[in-house]
UniProtKB/Swiss-Prot annotation:
GO terms for biological process: phenylalanyl-tRNA aminoacylation. Its EC number is 6.1.1.20. It comes from Desulforudis audaxviator (strain MP104C). This is Phenylalanine--tRNA ligase alpha subunit. Its cofactor is Mg(2+). Tetramer of two alpha and two beta subunits. Its main location: cytoplasm. InterPro entries: aa-tRNA-synth_II (IPR006195), aa-tRNA-synth_II/BPL/LPL (IPR045864), Phe-tRNA-synth_IIc_asu (IPR004529), Phe-tRNA_ligase_II_N (IPR004188), Phe_tRNA_ligase_alpha1_bac (IPR022911), Phenylalanyl-tRNA_Synthase (IPR002319), tRNA-bd_arm (IPR010978). CDD domains: PheRS_alpha_core (cd00496). It catalyses: tRNA(Phe) + L-phenylalanine + ATP = L-phenylalanyl-tRNA(Phe) + AMP + diphosphate + H(+). PROSITE patterns: AA_TRNA_LIGASE_II. The gene is pheS. Keywords: Aminoacyl-tRNA synthetase, ATP-binding, Cytoplasm, Ligase, Magnesium, Metal-binding, Nucleotide-binding, Protein biosynthesis.
Amino acid sequence: MREKLAQVVEEAEKALAGASTAEVVEEVRIRYLGKKGVLTQVLRSMGSLPAAERPVVGKLANEMKVRLEQALASRSALLKQEEKAARLAAERIDVTLPGVLPHLGSMHPLTMVRTEIENIFLGLGFQIVEGPEVELEYYNFEALNFPKDHPARDMQDTFFINDEVLLRTHTSPVQVRTFEKTAPRVPVRIIAPGKVYREDDDATHSPMFNQVEGFAVDTRITLGDLKGTLVYFVREMFGERRMRFRPSFFPFTEPSAEVDISCVICGGGGCRVCSHTGWLEILGAGMIHPRVLEVSGYDAEKVSGFAFGMGIERVAMLKYGIDNIRLFFDNDLRFLNQF
């Protein structure tokens, strides 16, 4: 029995040595260790041995089984390594071939429009200044000549944090903060882009939106300078458009005006977008109120200035024909991939 066990294991080891694939190794395992395998049959025949030999032969049989199992595992591991090495060699990367570029995103339409606005005014000699979004009530209202009973100070229109702190409702506070640093020096030409917050939410309004404030101060600035600046801006942003200035009111400018351009959809002929008026409002503007200059440190008798403000979403909606402001914030790739 001992000789037979040794012979079976030697035959199995020879078969393994010649195995070149994992499939052949599995065939050897089944042939010798399977339910009907050679070694299995030998072990089952131990019952015919004399009782005195069974413990010795049983121990030897288990040792032979373990030896064969180890040989099978060793050969399988070796073949897997060789197979992996061959696969890697066949899949060698040719670094001279062009790679596959990852999908590149694009700029958000609001970022594109903001950058375009900034570049237009940078070309006119303006500088970019930013201010805090969490603002003091003084800079947001009082320093900008808002009376105590102005509707904008109502809790229904403004997000107040406490009696003196709020989320700014416009970027105009940057104007006063800048003047406090520059007064009495002139000239000053600044644009102030940033986020603002108002209690408003519908198809054309959002509780958070982006605005650009622009202002200039010098010794002899007139309404004509304001008009010339805005005419240039409209031409650069929208192309050749008719413009009109409508009298309006803002606490921090006097005189004040709303600025309209001929409809970007119908060209001024009248359509649903412009409510059949032929005009679309794009911004508010005016000459800086003397009181705003004085509280900021300027002598209103010696200097003057103009200011204007526009919503970036509003400009983008007009420029691209978008009719719902919520599209800018929905993160819908079907919309964003168009830009």
